[in-house]
Amino acid sequence: MITSETVYHFVGIKGSGMSALALVLNDLGYQVQGSDIDQYTFTQRDLEKADIKILPFSADNLHEGLTVIAGNAFQDDQIEIKTALEMGLPVVRYHQFLGELLKNYTSIGVAGAHGKTSTSGLLAHVLSGVAKTSFLVGDGTGKGIKDAQFFAFEADEYRRHFLAYSPDYLIMTNIDFDHPDYYTGIEDVFDAFQSEAYKVQKGIFAWGDDPELRKLKSNAPIYYYGTKSNDDFQARNIQRTVEGSEFDAYYHDENIGHYHVPLYGEHNVLNSLAVIAVSYLEKIDGREVVRELADFKGVKRRFTEKKVADVTIIDDYAHHPSEIKATLDAARQKYPDRQIVAVFQPHTFTRTIALMDDFAASLNLADEVFLTDIFSSAREKSGKVSSADLGAKITKGGRVLKLDNMSPLLDFEQPVVVFMGAGDVQKYEYAYEELLSNLSPKDN
C-alpha cells in the first residue's frame, strides 16, 4: 500500500528507472530521498532540480519511518538493503512498487528487447499533450499527476521484472535474445513475453514483422502494427528525408491520418505507429496526435546530437546489434552525404561473446568503426573476451581507442561520429569534444 505516512528511500536512486519513479512520487506529494554512488550521472540533474536529497551509500541513512525501494541492480546483501531488512523496515523492489502504483490509472506499458525508451518517451509526450498523464521513461524522466487519466511506462523484461505489471495496454516492439547472463535463448525470452501477454487487460500492440510476436496468445485482443497488408495498423506511403519521416496511418483500410515525426530511422516510423494505434483505440482526437507527434524532441541518450567545430556528434544508448543497426540507419537518413564513424563501447562480457558476429555485422554498416574497452557490469568484472577480438571481425576498421588518445578520430573530414553504448561511453565522447575544442584553426 502506498502511503504518505512514510519517507520513501531509494537505494540506487540514480538508476534510470529509479530516478524516474522518485520523480513521480515526489510530484504526487510523497516524501522521497535516496542514495547512490558519488559519480555524476545524467539522471542526477532532474533529481537535484526537484530538491530530492541524494546521499552516499551508508547504513547510517536508515532509520525508523522509512520504506526502502530497492534498485534491481543490488542484491539483498547491499549494505543499506541488508540493514533495512535487519531493522524490520519495509523493503520493496522497484518493479513491485511500480506494479502497485499503476493500479490507480489506465496504464500503457512499452516492452521489447529494443525501442522501449524511445517508444515510451514518445507515448508519454503524445498522451501528456492531450490528457492528464503520469509517466515513467527509461531515460530517467518521470512525472506524476495526482488525477491523471493515463500512466505511460517502460516495462523491462530483464529477469522477468515486467511480470509485476498487469497493464491495460502493452506495446511490444520486438522479441530478441539479449541479457545472456539471465536468459538462456530466444525461447526463454519468448516465454517471458508470453507470460506477460496473459496479464494485459485491454489490448496488446505488437510489431507484425516479428515472428516471435506473431506466436503470442492473450486473453486481450492483439493488434499488429507495421507496413504489411496483414497488419491491423499500417504505415503506408512512407517518406524518409533529412527533415524526418512522414506516412499515412491506416487501421485496416481506414485512413486515420497523415503524420510527420522529426525522427529518423525505420524503427521510429514503427514506434510512432504503435503510439498512434494506442491513441486511436482510446478515441483520442487524431488531430491532436498529429500535432504532438510533430513536436516531439526525443529522449535522453537516444540519437542525441551536438555540433563541435565541423563535426556532428551523436550520443546513443545502443548496445545490442539490432539497436546499432537502427541507430546507423537513422544517421544515414539524416546525413546521407556525410561519413559515418562509429565508436562503440561493448557492454558486458557475456553479451559480447554471445552476439559477437552480429555486433560485427551491424557495426560494418558504418564507414569506419572504433571500439573502446568492454564495459563490465556490477555482476561481472572480467571475461574471456576483449574488444580486440570483436575488432578482428570488423572489416570497416575495428581499432580500439584509448581514453588518453582520441586523435585517430581526427582523420576524418566533417564526419558524423556516433558514440554508442550503455556503459560510460560518454567519457570518450567528452574527451573527443575536448580534443576538438583545443585544436587551433587551420592556417589559410
From Swiss-Prot:
Record-linked InterPro entries: Mur-like_cat_sf, Mur_ligase_C, Mur_ligase_C_dom_sf, Mur_ligase_cen, Mur_ligase_N, MurCDEF_pg_biosynth, UDP-N-AcMur_Ala_ligase_MurC
Binding of ATP, residues: 112-118
Gene Ontology biological process terms, A to Z: cell division; cell wall organization; peptidoglycan biosynthetic process; regulation of cell shape
Functional pathway: Cell wall biogenesis; peptidoglycan biosynthesis
Intracellular or extracellular location(s): Cytoplasm
Record has Hydrolase as a keyword: no
Main localisation: cytoplasm
Nucleotide-binding keyword on record: yes
Catalysed reactions, semicolon-separated: UDP-N-acetyl-alpha-D-muramate + L-alanine + ATP = UDP-N-acetyl-alpha-D-muramoyl-L-alanine + ADP + phosphate + H(+)
Entry similarity comment: Belongs to the MurCDEF family.
NCBIfam families linked to this entry: murC
Function, in words: Cell wall formation.
PANTHER family attached to this UniProt entry: UDP-N-ACETYLMURAMATE--L-ALANINE LIGASE, UDP-N-ACETYLMURAMATE--L-ALANINE LIGASE-RELATED
Protein name from the UniProt record: UDP-N-acetylmuramate--L-alanine ligase
